[in-house]
């Protein structure tokens, strides 16, 4: 099968319609009478200058009111009803043939591609937008036509300068993926705006998903200015920077050196240097560093759904020095189980070696990522039985104040 050429002359078409020549002062009344019978096509006006006027684009004495394509005969004006035809003739209005010239620029993406792609092939008219980049995930049968698809999307979206296609799955430890430029500039440096923050980054070097904007906002709204946030897998800062803009202190970490680079750039860009401290460590090492330095935090974010659950093994028995309430943890993961909540809860408990308190555990289904596979956020307050070592738990049991409270409760 040969791939199609983008021949824009294929889309030159003439649309012949009936026009009603009307004096300018009568236009409003006649348009109202013709409601339901007017030309109704995207981006086309149904009241246009009268081409018979010497200078039709200036205030002239007449205009053309264009009827929809069902009205073909200027003599009978069918399917207009008799009363409407009588009204038009009583007004002594003239009926003329009017040609509308259409070309490639008029037609939408799906209309163009439906002409260029084989019959029955899905039209890839939806895509993720990241700054000036359109990101496609083309199917195998669409790949022979990838360049023409890219060119059409580029032509039809004024804000797009680059069209890329993912060529393989996300399999790197930094969650980046291989891509190829289908059309436009080979420019991966983008700037996006989200949650009242600005972010700059190279789309080929870091992970960014515009479809997670609402999920970012959901968590950001939960975090209050008095909170201190430990963001273990922060990327370029979609959580860290906005919560800092809201007044929270943040310890933000990412293993990818390029994410770390852009994280620091975005911290400076948004002027939150005094509130965000950036780290470039493995997530477990980062948590251990904060705990060894006796840093206190109230919220922990773990946004690496492919493996974040595994990092919960860094929590058990590491909080013996802790003062006050233990932090809340928000951990993202994938699940393909029938009972998603039970599956995620059991996996988290198995990794941490203890049970979560049902009263302090909640779940949020973020989005479907594949058939029978969902992205989930489990949120829970870290239980004492997991956070503290057996020695710390034993010492708490022997605490005189705790024994007194227990005795009073038993009385």
From Swiss-Prot:
InterPro entries for this protein: MeTrfase_TRM5/TYW2, SAM-dependent_MTases_sf, TRM5-TYW2-like_MTfase, TRM5/TYW2-like_N, tRNA_Gua_MeTrfase_euk
Top class in the EC scheme: transferase
Entry GO terms, CC: mitochondrial matrix; nucleus
Main location: mitochondrion
Localization: Mitochondrion matrix; Nucleus; Cytoplasm
Function: Specifically methylates the N1 position of guanosine-37 in various cytoplasmic and mitochondrial tRNAs. Methylation is not dependent on the nature of the nucleoside 5' of the target nucleoside. This is the first step in the biosynthesis of wybutosine (yW), a modified base adjacent to the anticodon of tRNAs and required for accurate decoding.
HAMAP family: TRM5
Protein name (database record): tRNA (guanine(37)-N(1))-methyltransferase
Taxonomic source organism: Phytophthora infestans (strain T30-4)
């Amino acid at each position: 099968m040969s791939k199609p050429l983008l021949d824009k002359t294929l889309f030159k078409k003439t649309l012949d319609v009936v026009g009603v020549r009307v004096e300018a002062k009568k236009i409003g009344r006649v348009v109202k009478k013709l409601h339901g019978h007017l030309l109704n096509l995207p981006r086309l006006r149904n009241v246009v200058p009268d081409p018979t006027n010497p200078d039709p684009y200036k205030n002239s004495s007449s205009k053309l009111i264009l009827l929809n394509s069902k009205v073909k005969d200027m003599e009978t004006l069918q399917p207009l009803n008799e009363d409407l035809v009588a009204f038009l003739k009583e007004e002594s209005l003239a009926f003329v043939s009017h040609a509308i010239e259409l070309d490639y620029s008029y037609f939408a993406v799906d209309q163009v591609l439906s002409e260029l792609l084989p019959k029955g092939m899905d039209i890839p008219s939806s895509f993720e937008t990241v700054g000036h980049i359109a990101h496609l995930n083309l199917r195998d049968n669409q790949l022979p036509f990838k360049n023409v698809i890219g060119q059409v999307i580029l032509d039809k979206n004024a804000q797009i300068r680059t069209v890329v296609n993912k060529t393989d799955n996300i399999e790197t430890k930094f969650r980046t993926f291989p891509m190829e430029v289908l059309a436009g500039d080979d420019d991966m440096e983008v700037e996006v705006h989200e949650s009242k923050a600005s972010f700059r980054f190279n789309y080929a070097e870091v992970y960014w998903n515009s479809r997670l904007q609402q999920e970012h906002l959901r968590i950001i709204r939960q975090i209050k200015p008095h909170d201190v946030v430990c963001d273990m897998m922060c990327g370029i800062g979609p959580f860290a920077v906005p919560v800092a803009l809201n007044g929270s202190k943040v310890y933000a970490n990412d293993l990818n050196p390029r994410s770390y680079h852009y994280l620091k750039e975005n911290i400076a860009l948004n002027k939150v240097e005094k509130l965000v401290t950036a780290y470039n460590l493995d997530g477990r090492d980062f948590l251990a560093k904060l705990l060894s330095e006796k840093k206190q935090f109230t919220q922990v974010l773990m946004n690496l759904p492919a493996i974040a659950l595994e990092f919960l093994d860094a929590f058990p028995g590491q909080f013996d020095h802790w003062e006050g309430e233990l932090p809340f943890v928000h951990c993202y993961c994938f699940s393909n189980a029938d009972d998603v909540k039970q599956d995620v809860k059991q996996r988290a408990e198995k990794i941490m070696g203890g049970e979560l308190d049902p009263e302090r555990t909640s779940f949020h289904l973020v989005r479907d990522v594949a058939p029978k596979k969902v992205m989930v956020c489990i949120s829970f307050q870290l239980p004492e039985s997991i956070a503290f070592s057996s020695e710390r738990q034993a010492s708490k049991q022997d605490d005189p104040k705790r024994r007194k409270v227990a005795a009073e409760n038993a009385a």
